[in-house]
Amino acid sequence: MARKSLIQREKKRQKLEQKYHSIRRSSKKEISKVPSLSDKWEIYGKLQSPPRNSAPTRLHRRCFLTGRPRANYRDFGLSGHILREMVHACLLPGATRSSW
């Protein structure tokens, strides 16, 4: 189980990313429209003004139950070993164990 502080830090990053998402998107659109290099550099400066933790690349998927940051399945929002346990216990409808 991940520490509570790490999970809270990730939630804080998600809120910041949502807050600054429109600003980043509009700045990137402006860059493609502006022909002069000096204007582009000004817009790049605006892109660097939001906090670092508001960048979408700093977000990390975590397991919904345990907060584990590795081996996450996007479809379920669970880490691999929790997913396996839940499938074995028949808690996920439609998921079957592979057998050959």
Swiss-Prot record:
User: Which InterPro entries would you find in this protein's record?
Assistant: Ribosomal_uS14, Ribosomal_uS14_bac/plastid, Ribosomal_uS14_CS
Name the principal localization, coarsely classed.
Answer: plastid
**Molecular function as annotated in GO:** rRNA binding; structural constituent of ribosome
GO CC terms in record = chloroplast; ribonucleoprotein complex; ribosome
Under Gene3D superfamilies, the record lists: 1.10.287.1480
The cellular location(s) given in this protein's UniProt record come to:
Plastid, Chloroplast
Q: Which protein family is it in?
A: Belongs to the universal ribosomal protein uS14 family.
UniProt keyword list: Chloroplast, Plastid, Ribonucleoprotein, Ribosomal protein, RNA-binding, rRNA-binding
GO biological process per UniProt: translation
Region named Disordered: 1-31
Protein name (Swiss-Prot/TrEMBL): Small ribosomal subunit protein uS14c
The superkingdom listed in its UniProt entry is Eukaryota
Q: How does it assemble?
A: Part of the 30S ribosomal subunit.
Protein role: Binds 16S rRNA, required for the assembly of 30S particles.
